[in-house]
Every structure is written in structure tokens, then in C-alpha cells.
Amino acid sequence: MVVATTIALYASPPSSVCSTPHQISCDLDLTSRSSSTSSSMASSPQKPIVGGLSSLFSSASVKSSSSSSCSYSTAVDEFSSLRYDRSDDLKDLSFSSSFGYSPAKFVNSFRRDHQSPISVLHGPVSCSCSPPMRMSRDRNLDGSFRLGASRLFNGFVRKALGSCVDYELGSDSGLVDELTFPMEVDTIKPYARDLLRRAQLRHKIFNDESVIKAFYEAEKAHRGQMRASRDPYLQHCVETAMLLANIGANSTVVVAGLLHDTVDDSFMSYDYILRNFGAGVADLVEGVSKLSQLSKLARENNTACKTVEADRLHPMFLAMADARAVLIKLADRLHNMKTLYALSPVKQQRFAKETLEIFAPLANCLGISTWKVQLENLCFKHLYPNQHNEMSTMLEDSFDEAMITSAIEKLDQALKKAGISYHVLCGRHKSLYSIYSKMLKKKLTVDEIHDIHGLRLIVDNEGDCYKALGVVHSLWSEVPGKLKDYITHPKFNGYQSLHTVVMDNGTVPLEVQIRTQEMHLQAEFGFAAHWRYKEGGCKYSSFVLQMVEWARWVVTWHCEAMSKDRSSISSSDSIKPPLQVFRLTLEDCPASYKPNSSQDGPVYVIVIENDKMSVQEFPASSTVSDLLSRAGPGSSRWSMYGIPAKEELRPRLNQIPVSDLKWKLKMGDVVELTPKIPDESLTEYREEIQRMYDRGLAFSRPGTMVGWGS
């Protein structure tokens, strides 16, 4: 009976949401525990070769269900298994207290089908136009009353957290004493309560029931963990989630933001999150983990300094995970960059370089311009501190927010008076890094940069563009030679707009861009999108382009709710999705983007050889055999014993040995090349080692002196 009781205690996860490992229920059902234990010990079938990084970092549903409970701090970091290193993204933590158990992983309970490595938006995206439905706190979704605290999700279907159903929140709905799920109030640290209350004051989404639950799960998972800045790790989780909330992310994304490091840095597993928060959140957290592991590989191999390979990583990040997971990773990196001062100068340089070459362009691909600007400026500060200080001093008085606001008000009134309606009127300051880059590229001084301040106006039609241009020139004096008519004379990539530079108050130049809705959509999501035309001429396949455009659109659409841009048109007439661009995906909208089997462009594959990673481009339909041909059928290498050996390369595709060399490579595949020593070389090695051993015995005999004759 004692043995059976012990098995029951340690074969199941805690029964309540925030229980500690010290609270053990004595109400045991030995029969049911025994069966669940045996089922959890059953081995799962061997995983087939599946393309993509999603196969490299195996999901919980295809891992072996036989796992032992062990402390996280004793885990072995083995490069061949590509385990995640907690040093990634500023995780220099000290574990003053942590949980000494790992919840059982009920792998066979929730089996998921293998998905293609190229999948975007795994979880459902809300596109409902109906108002949010109020959910009673006393009833389940199916109308039944809750029978107890453990029935929180009774009646919820899988992926309910990703649906368009939302709560109508009250101002005090986030208090602990109103929670409908069990919470051991005595175990909650005072700093955690204060952190939650401050977050609720900053954004209303932190009053959401699922967000509060995720907050306390994150507190439990990261309890005792500290960052290099000596702040509690929980604070980083909250700041990451806050960044997501501030750009309009829904509760599913915010919950995943709170839990984004739990799989890598705590006892939590994919199945634990799946049981408590649903597949939508679990998939996002798993996606962030995969991105972190790829980021670590790239940083260890200095990929950021290899321009072409860094460019290939951008579509690969979007190919291997949900676009919203990329968004969470960007928020994680942005907050890490804000606290980069806590690391050594060497680490600051390394992280800043990676961020500038990989993450800032990725934010640009997704259309999150505010994050792109912040990331670039923070990188500029750490990579070029002297130039950053100099630019900051020179432009300290130039960044006049009041001037931009005044210009918007002035133009708005003039447009109304002229009877010109518009969709968007917004202003911006050019970032420090953008100004510095433009000065270097075009060899200009600060006074010669005329687009430090800018306005953008989006109107109905082409005729209104020219009418609005006349209004602008009537308000401010035009700078001669700075009018560019890209409507009549489009750029080579199809970009169309009117650009003009005027002088505000006679001293400060102000650039004004005027375009129609169609021109704006083409510039942001279509062929003219500037993220496509990075220097170096890196060209993406049509499938990758469509995938990135869709991800960019979804992120922009989700963030539109937080836009503060002025409009003279009702919201029902605002900019609509570009139906002609995403015709192929609207059939399943808002489901995830489905890969196109007729991919005709290049694929990017990660090749690991001699513990070094490279991102290589292969034509469509390339095979493992083609990769080996490029690497060479074999190479003559000199061994440590001076014996030349012809080594054959033995490939592993996504951690699985390859027997069929005709297997086609897919976007995001990881191929490890290890040398296979022929039998004749092994014979020579053994003979040489035997001779060395014999010489060693001769030297060690009594009376024998090395280097002296007898």
C-alpha cells in the first residue's frame, strides 16, 4: 500500500492551478492512478521524418511519453539534441527556489497531427464584427451552473481561448477574491500581487480571467528566478505581455506572452499548458520555444554577421511558427533590449548585433514599425555609443512632438474646409538610427536630411491626392526640387505616392506623403513593400512572399484596434483587407494559412557540419543527395595520428538518420552532417593506437629512461 500511494503521488500533476508541491491530497484512487501511470509509460511509435524546424524541435505529442521526474537545474545541455540554453535572451538566472518535480506528461492523451514546417497562424483568428458577448461568471458556456472551482473550463471546447468570444470586463474584475478558479492566496508573494495590480491599471486586458490565471501560473513557474538586472523574472513576463497588449493583441496572445518562457525555464510542459489553457496558447508557447532555439543556434554561429544568411532567416522564422509566435518573440526581444545594460559589454554587443540584423528586419516584415524603430535605436545605442550620443545631442531639440500634433490639426481643418475626406492622417519622427544610416549611405549632414518629421495622408482617389497636395502647399512653403510624383512616374517596384517637403514655421522641414488606399496596400503588403528590397538582392520564392504578406496583414489587422491615427471617415468605411492579394486564403479565413504544394521557388535549409551552422539555399525539389553533392561526397582529412582518411558524410534530417537520399528538402529542414569513418581507416586507427600503447608500456618499465641510450 505504501508503494502504491507513492506512485499515485508522483505520477500526477498538482490538482489546483497554483498549488505548491508541498500540498498533497490524501483522497487517492489507487486503481485509476495505476492505469493512468501505466498508460503514461507506454512508448509512442517512432516519429517519421517530417520536414521543418517543427520536426527538429519535436512537439510534445510525438515525444516519448516515458519521462522521469528530474530537477531542471540538473538537465544536461547536449548540442546534438539542440536543447535550449537558458542563456538565450538574457536568462542569466539564479534559482534560489524552484519546484523539485516535473508534472507527468500525458502524451497519449492529446495527439496532434504532424503539420507542415511552413504553417502560419495555427490558432484561429477572430474576425467577428459582432460586439463581444458577455459571459456570466456563474454559468458555463453550455448554460450549466458550475459545481465547484475545479469546473472552470467545464463545457469549454478545445481552442475556446482562441475564439472570438470575449468577456465584458468590469473595473474590479481582476481581484483575487473574485477569481472563479482555486488560488492559494497565502502562497502568492506580495510583489506578485502588486505587479498584477499595476499591470491592471496600465491595461484592462490584465483583468481578463484567463490572463489573471496565466499570471499566477507564470509566477509559480518562475518563482525564485531572477534576471541579470536583479529583477524578478516574472516582471519580464509581464512586460512582454504588456508590449503585446499595447499593440492590440487579444487575450490568447497575451496569455502566451506571460507563459512564453515556461516550457524552457520551468517544470511546465506543452501538455500542462494544453490542459490548463487550451491548444491555442500551448501552440504559441511551443512556437516561441522553437524560435528561441533557432535564435541561439544563429547567435552561436555568428549568423548575424553573414548578411545573406541573416536575410534567409527572416522568412524561415515565419515558416517555422505561427505569425503570432513571432510577434511574442519580438516582444520578448524588445524588453530584453531595454534591459541590456545589466549584461557585460561583450554580451551587449552580441545581442545588439543579432537584434539589428535579424529581429529588427523581422519586425519590419510584419509591419510593426514602432517596434522596429525601438529595436534599431536600442541597437544603435549599444553598438555605436559615441555616435548615438552625438546624434542624440544634435537632434534633442528637433524631435518636437507638439509640432507634429499642430501640423496634423492644421492640415485636418484645411482638408475639411476644402471638402476632402481622408482615411488616415498620421505623423512620425524619423528614428535616430534611420537618420544615421541615411547620412552614411548618402554622405549627408543632419541639416540635409529633410524627412526627420513627416505626415502621411491616405485619401479616396487619385484626384484627391493632387487636391490635397494643393492644400498642403497653401499651408506651408514648398522646398524647391523636393516634389516627387510617384503616381505619374511609379518606382520600378510599382510604388506610387506623392512626396513633398515643406517648411513648417520657416525653419523645420516637414515631408508629406499622399496616397490612395490601393497605393497604401500595395506599399505595405504588395509587390512594392519595401521589406522585399533589402540591399544585397536577396530574392524570396513566391510562396514565401505570399506567406510573409499574409502574416504581415494578420498582424496589422490585429493591431489596428490600437491605432491612434486620425480619420475623417467612419470605421465602417476604413481600409479593408486586400482581397485580391489573399484570394487563396480567404476560403479558410480565419484558419491558418495552408502551404501550397506547388512551390517553385528556392528553399532554405540549415546545415550543421563540424558544430557550425549555415543557412543554405537550394532549388525547389532538391534532395538530400543534392545537399551531399554540394558538401562533397567525401573529403581527405588528416587524423590526429597523421593517418589520411577518406570520410563519408552521414546525414541526419531533423535529428533522424536518413536512409533514402532521394528525400526532398523542405523549407526549414535541419540537416546534420557527421563523418562516417570507413572500416579500413578504423583498422589503421586501431593499429596506430596499439603501437602508441606499446611504446607507453616500454617507457614506463623500471630502469627505462626516455631519450637515453642503454
Swiss-Prot record:
PROSITE patterns: HD
Taxonomic placement: Eukaryota, Viridiplantae, Streptophyta, Embryophyta, Tracheophyta
Any GO BP: guanosine tetraphosphate metabolic process
Keyword entries, A-Z: ATP-binding, Chloroplast, GTP-binding, Kinase, Nucleotide-binding, Plastid, Stress response, Transferase, Transit peptide
UniProt enzyme class: transferase
Protein name: Probable GTP diphosphokinase RSH2, chloroplastic
Protein family membership: Belongs to the RelA/SpoT family.
Catalytic activity: GTP + ATP = guanosine 3'-diphosphate 5'-triphosphate + AMP
